[in-house]
Structure formats: C-alpha cells, structure tokens
Amino acid sequence: MAVYNYDVVVLGSGPAGEGAAMNAAKAGRKVAMVDSRRQVGGNCTHLGTIPSKALRHSVRQIMQFNTNPMFRAIGEPRWFSFPDVLKSAEKVISKQVASRTGYYARNRVDLFFGTGSFADEQTVEVVCPNGVVEKLNAKHIIIATGSRPYRPADIDFHHPRVYDSDTILSLSHTPRKLIVYGAGVIGCEYASIFSGLGVLVELVDNRGQLLSFLDSEISQALSYHFSNNNITVRHNEDYERVEGLDNGVILHLKSGKKIKADALLWCNGRTGNTDKLGLENIGIKVNSRGQIEVDEAYRTSVPNIYGAGDVIGWPSLASAAHDQGRSAAGSIVDNGSWRFVNDVPTGIYTIPEISSIGKNEQELTQAKVPYEVGKAFFKSMARAQIAGEPQGMLKILFHRETLEILGVHCFGYQASEIVHIGQAVMNQPGELNNLKYFVNTTFNYPTMAEAYRVAAYDGLNRLF
C-alpha cells in the first residue's frame, strides 16, 4: 500500500471539489483530488448540468429551424432522434474533461481515480480500478461527492423502459410518449427537451404549482408554455406503483388514474453520495437524504473535515457548489476567500429559460415590505424581435420609498444571462443599489439588457 501526505484531500471533482482544490492549491497547499470516475468533472460534467444544457441547446436549434419561416422556405421540417442530439453533448463533455484536467495539471493537484473512503479522521484510502489501495494522509479533507437521483425501492430501475436523470443519457431511441415523474427543476428541464423533439410529455407533479419557489407570475408563464408545447402537467398526484411492460410502462397514481407511455423518467428527489465514504469510521452522520450537515464555515462535526456542494443539500446548484467548495478551502487556508454562499441566482434551463435572484412577490407581501413592480415584455424589445424570441419578460421588484432593488425575475430568451446585471446592482452597498441606475445607464442597442431600462421606467411610472 502506497502512502502519500497532503495538506488537503478533496473527495469529488465536480464544481464543489474543483473550487476547493483550486483555491487550496493557489494558496500554496499540497492538494490531492479523488474521484470514483476515471475522468474529472463529476456528475455535473458527465451526467447532469453539461449534457442536459448541451441537449437543450441542440433542441432549441432544431425548434428554431422547424418554426422559422425563413428556414421553411429552404426545406421541410427536420426531426432528429434523441441519440443523434446526444452526440453534440458528448463532444462538449470531452472538451470539458480536457479543460478541467488541464486545470489540475497546471495547479499541481495530484489526481487519484478510485473509490475513496475514510479510514480515520485524517486518512483516506483509495481503492483503484486495478484493485490497488493507496493511502492518503491529510491535515484537512473536503467532502464534495455530490448527489445522485433518489430511487424508491419499489420501482424497478433495471427495467429497460424506466430511467432516472442519470440513465436517461443512455436512451437509445426517441419515445413517442414520455412520463416525467417529478416537476422539480430537472423534471421541467427534461420535459422541455423531449417536448422540443416532438415527444408527447406527461409531467406528473406532486405539488399544486410548478416550481413553487419561483415568483408566481413566472411559474404561471412556464405552465402556459408547457401546455402550449405538448406537455400535459398533472398536479397534486402521487405514484402508487410503476408497471413495466415489454413495450412501455404504466404509471398507477394514488388518485386512481393510470398513464401509459413508451418510457418513464423519474426525477423526484436526490440523495447525497455518502454511503461509500465510511463516515461511520469518523462519526459523521447523514440525514434521511444522505446529506452532511455543516456550519457556516462548511465544517462538519469533525473539525478538520469539510463539506460542499450537493452533498450538503441546498441550494444544489453547480454555480453555488463551486463557490461553496472555494469557501470551504478558504476556511482552511484563511486567505480571505471564505463567504457563506446564500444569495445566488437561480438558473432553470427550460424552454424558455428562467432565472431569478432575490425576493419574489409572495415573500415581500408576506413580510409586509412596501414594494413596487417594473416590467419589460420581450415582445416589445427590438433584440427579441430580431432573434424571433418574443416570449418572456423581465420583472424588477424594488422598494417604493428607497428604490432599493429587492428581486429580479426573468423568463425567456437569455434569462440566465440577463439576471446577472440585476445581481451586480443588488450587490452594491447602501444607496448604490438603486433602480435609477438602469435609467441613468446607457445600454447597447439593440440588446436584451436594455429591458432593465424599460422595466425601470415602468416601475417608476407606478409611483405616486
């Protein structure tokens, strides 16, 4: 058994692990990275964020070709199979792996591929694919092993027609009809992707509203666009059992309804990847979702062991995970990079996409904050008209007395990019966070960004 000594060992090479390893390495620490896959990037790169967003991009291009009158003059609509579209995602994954492998090499982070588990509070044992065991001693260890889809024991995920958000990438055909169980972020994104490929989608939601954490107006807009694009949403429904057939699947609901489709995609919940870490050897406990509890410094109940990313739960976003990992390492190296990551933008890559930051109307009303609303509808924006993307809006919530921006909510073309302008202003201290910034700033024309000026004027016109 080979033995190595490090200042910091990071378990998991997803966004959280990468952020942690890079920060520690740049602070002069000797760092090792352990990942169970033979390539870096974690589930984000190989199974989650990157492939699903690459799929979405390709599907949007197909949709634009099939609906744009200019392209219709060239030829007939074209339809692509899911495996064909997936090829573009595979190319992006390869490029991401190459880039990230280079990051570790340039920063002299040692990579170990294999299953890592705790022998004690300062020792990680890595079982390599060839069976060799390597022992890593470390002053500090950061757990960033991510999460995986939750799989109820009563559902046969080995059935060839039953998938989760990891295994859906192995789908070898394009179903005519698909059941998506779970209308969270992942479920809504995949519902959009398959709908864009011409698949009839049944989206089963066990709640009464899509993505209820969003501003209600944005949630309602998403519901409208879903119903307008071959996505049937069934609210307040819970599964009773899943019946696998030779040529499809039947979902039995507790309400007595039955839905038959060519395949079922399970998108209801995620579980932290902690079961193989040997946490029982160091006294760290996990909750019912397999997640680790940490304090504001991202420290676990064991002082020299930290956690970051999906494995600690909320907000389970790749962007936040990277910052959490960087902050966890910042707590170790004490270079001023620590911060508690709590106010992050939400990006939801449905078609059209959604992004938001700050408070929504429901929260401000409940808190009795005197706010006002400014809106800009994309159908009136020159850039949206040029791009043929008239659906959507930008919504700014601000304090009617101080003009402080309290929340920004965007639905439509480039929403996940547009939101960062509002985020930058909201992060300014004191009176610099002011709605009038958008009135007094010159925006390029035509751009989607100028929606901020339109929305600001709309909001100011509501004041009296």
From Swiss-Prot:
Positions of FAD binding: D35, S36, R37, R38, Q39, V40, G41, G42, N43, C44
Catalysed reaction, written as an equation: NAD(+) + NADPH = NADH + NADP(+)
Keyword match Oxidoreductase: yes
Family of this protein: Belongs to the class-I pyridine nucleotide-disulfide oxidoreductase family.
Cofactor remark: Binds 1 FAD per subunit.
Cofactor: FAD
An MF annotation (GO) of this entry: dihydrolipoyl dehydrogenase (NADH) activity
Name under which the protein is recorded: Soluble pyridine nucleotide transhydrogenase
Keyword Zinc: no
Keywords: Cytoplasm, FAD, Flavoprotein, NAD, NADP, Oxidoreductase
Known role: Conversion of NADPH, generated by peripheral catabolic pathways, to NADH, which can enter the respiratory chain for energy generation.
InterPro entries: Class-I_Pyr_Nuc-Dis_Oxidored, FAD/NAD-bd_sf, FAD/NAD-binding_dom, FAD/NAD-linked_Rdtase_dimer_sf, Pyr_nuc-diS_OxRdtase, Pyr_nucl-diS_OxRdtase_dimer, STH_gammaproteobact
A UniProt-annotated Pfam family: Pyr_redox_dim
Listed GO biological process terms: 2-oxoglutarate metabolic process; NADP metabolic process
EC number assigned by the record: 1.6.1.1
Compartments where found: Cytoplasm
GO cellular component: cytosol
